[in-house]
Amino acid sequence: MKKVTTSTLLKMKQQSEKISALTAYDASFSKLFDEQGIDVLLIGDSLGMVLQGCDDTLGVSIDDVAYHTRAVRKGVERAFVIADMPFMSYSTPEQTYLNAAKLMAAGASMVKLEGGRWLLESIQGLNERGVPVCGHLGLTPQSVHVFGGFKVQGRDDLQAEQMLEQAKEMAAAGIQLLVLECVPTELAGAISQAVDIPVIGIGAGPETDGQILVMHDMFGISANYMPKFSKNYLQETGDMRTAVSQYIEEVKDGSFPSEAHSFSK
């Protein structure tokens, strides 16, 4: 079983093969997802909401993410493992380097940062220090209070243009992957075409290079509500393994997400 690497993901984009991704937080589920053929696993700061029961992700610490990264890594043989850098753990380049080192030591193969051009120095510095970086634009949950809630981003022309330019700048600075969350399908498609790196969407329509969902949403077991962009695969299949396999299959063949799970301008 050949391991997924940054080179694998880039080749998948170049060959128009969709990338499948899910969040994971422990060894049991990471093993289950890995065995079904998931390409990417993200230890998301979403753990603050789905595991810790909080209303947002802001209370998650770097130690929380490192703990779950160690657990996830133990269940994985093939999938590419990414760890979120949580709120205020990367405010300065120096702080970013130290905290990224903790996540890489815990078993991550890449770290994910939320934000735009203010991160360029940190992105370049991480690359120089051997740490692969995933960017995250659109609805960045750590900025929920700035946005005034969990809202679709990039619907007006100015905001869309700014997001496109920031994606280009971050790619030039050295990110090797980009997550777009809750942005209109047209914008997500334009960004995916404008950068050479793989773009993975969540609530960003079918035109990105891949899809990611929070595992609890994909299984329909989130405590609060089911986001518009998600789909309850466990309800459809009645079995966790089959649910994961169907999710992967629908991402690969392009049937998920449909228009019903996407946002328009």
Curated annotation (Swiss-Prot):
Binding site for 3-methyl-2-oxobutanoate: 45-46, 84, 112
Reactions accelerated catalytically: 3-methyl-2-oxobutanoate + (6R)-5,10-methylene-5,6,7,8-tetrahydrofolate + H2O = 2-dehydropantoate + (6S)-5,6,7,8-tetrahydrofolate
Co-factor binding comment: Binds 1 Mg(2+) ion per subunit.
Gene3D superfamilies assigned: Phosphoenolpyruvate-binding domains
InterPro entries referenced in this protein's UniProt entry, alphabetically: Pantoate_hydroxy_MeTrfase, Pyrv/PenolPyrv_kinase-like_dom, Pyrv_kinase-like_dom_sf
Subunit text: Homodecamer; pentamer of dimers.
Catalytic residues (UniProt): 181
Subcellular localization: Cytoplasm
Function description: Catalyzes the reversible reaction in which hydroxymethyl group from 5,10-methylenetetrahydrofolate is transferred onto alpha-ketoisovalerate to form ketopantoate.
Protein name: 3-methyl-2-oxobutanoate hydroxymethyltransferase
GO biological process, one term: pantothenate biosynthetic process
Keyword terms: Cytoplasm, Magnesium, Metal-binding, Pantothenate biosynthesis, Transferase
Names of the cofactor(s): Mg(2+)
Main location: cytoplasm
Binding site for Mg(2+): 45, 84, 114
Signal peptide: none
UniProt GO cellular component terms: cytoplasm
